[in-house]
Amino acid sequence: VEEHTRENIIRIMKELHYTPSQTARNLSMKSSSTVGVIVPEISNTFFGELFSGVEEITKRHNLSLLYSGNDNDMDTDYKALDMMKMQRVRGLLYIPAVNYSALGVLDKLQRKLDRMNCPIVCMDRDIGLKCDIVHFDDQSAVRKAVLALANEGHRKIAIIIGDKENILSVQRFEGYLEGLKKAGIPYDEDLVFRGTYTRVSGYQVTKQMIAKSKQPTAVITCNNLLSKGYIQAVCEHTHGKTDMYTHIGLDEIDMMQYLGIPYNCIQRDAYELGHSAAELLIKRLEQPDETFQHMILNSPLVHQTF
């Protein structure tokens, strides 16, 4: 383009307050400066912390972020992936919606991801994808929680957990069984309470547990939303007290710290998860031919009431 033509175009653009379309720019460049992030629930504070960790890294590299939620639903997950492909994201940080491996459709998902033609880092849930992976060892973490409670003399340890199809539920339940076995505590299915990973489900399942004749002395809740529902139900029953059972929750709850209420938890640092995943993605962008990495993050038990 001749210089005077270019100057005229720029002048007209300024007069009209024209902003170039990022989508059109991506299409012309066949790539973008945008990193896609797909998580189960954007509103969950755990994933808000994860986003902060991701942004810490992407800002350093002048990359913008495009978020989407999959609601732990396969169809919604596919739509989110299609949208990311259409936007030609430069890389993708991804938490699979469901256990595609157990459902027999892992190959279909892998082909879909391969067609995106960008680096992908799988976060939080290891379902066997061929890509970089970073997650916590939830199985080991729940096993440690059971043993910590057993060391305090508890023999009736209940668990409030998500549905059987969820890969995290599978791993956490295995940790629960391993902990019981190592502590010499017989497994009792009456102490297993299943729901979905939501606050409402945690509340409903806890109400069911409280109403049972066979009562636990300790309870493990398997994510922050289940823990919030559990606390709500217990506080209703005890008129504001949280110590009806000895309790360990998976993930921190900021609210407890702000209220000054002691809270036992398995600390899964969501910020570190996002930070580490973004670092892996940047490394993959810089070294695309390197062997895939599998990173397992530590999740210590933080206890304040025993």
What are these regions (language model features)?
Residues 30-43, 61-63:
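Interdomain hinge and pocket-entrance segments immediately C-terminal to HTH DNA-binding domains
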Residues 11, 15-16, 56-63, 82-91, ...:
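Bacterial carbohydrate/catabolite-sensing allosteric modules
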Residues 41-43, 71-72, 97-101, 163-167:
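Short histidine/acidic/glycine/proline-rich micro-motifs that form metal-
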Residues 75-79:
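Conserved ATP-dependent adenylate/AMP-binding module captured primarily in the ANL superfamily
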Residues 1-33, 120:
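N-terminal helix-turn-helix DNA-binding module of bacterial transcription factors
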Residues 37, 94, 221:
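Redox-cofactor binding/interface segments in oxidoreductases and associated redox assembly factors
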Residues 39-56:
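N-terminal winged-helix
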